[in-house]
């Protein structure tokens, strides 16, 4: 099975193939939508078992599927967004504290493949693809607690999440 292949291999071919299918023939995945979501969410959650790049590919499967078959994903969103959105927000908290930040003349862009950047851009893409009716409840529920956290990284991630989802959720906001 696909799950067995992914779990017992260091090869990302399965996830790359799922991304290609999601881009070019998303309807083909309709009968297996639950399996695809569960596989990708499980991969994303296993930080100790899989490298970041593989977890990012699993996320890309879900985001691409949401962009190319938004109606199909909206139908199952209630089952999975309560797990996916907190995962994205958790990725956005993965920031390094730079003690020299306040004295630098120029601000360096973060790496494009850092968890924080991938999480934020994925949240933006999901909000644009699925809209505020689908996404906003899940985002606000998690962001409210993040904004009250004493750790600056959580507050930063919460504010960035609101900013990132503004375009896709503007009618509901």
Pin down the residues of each PLM region.
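Karyopherin-beta/Importin-beta family HEAT-repeat alpha-solenoid scaffold
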Residues: 1-173
């Amino acid at each position: 099975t696909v799950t067995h292949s992914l779990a017992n291999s260091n090869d990302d071919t399965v996830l790359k193939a799922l991304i290609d299918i999601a881009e070019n023939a998303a309807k083909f995945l309709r009968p297996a939508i639950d399996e695809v979501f569960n596989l990708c969410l499980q991969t994303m959650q296993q930080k100790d078992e899989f490298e970041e790049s593989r977890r990012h590919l699993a996320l890309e499967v879900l985001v691409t599927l949401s962009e190319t078959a938004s109606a199909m994903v909206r139908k199952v969103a209630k089952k999975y967004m309560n797990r996916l959105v907190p995962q994205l927000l958790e990725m956005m908290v993965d920031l390094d504290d730079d003690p020299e930040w306040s004295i630098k003349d120029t601000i360096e862009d973060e790496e494009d493949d850092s968890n924080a950047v991938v999480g934020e851009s994925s949240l933006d893409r999901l909000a644009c693809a699925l809209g505020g009716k689908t996404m906003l409840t899940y985002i606000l529920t998690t962001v409210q607690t993040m904004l009250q956290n004493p750790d600056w990284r959580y507050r930063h991630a919460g504010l960035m999440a609101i900013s990132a989802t503004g375009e896709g959720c503007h009618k509901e906001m």
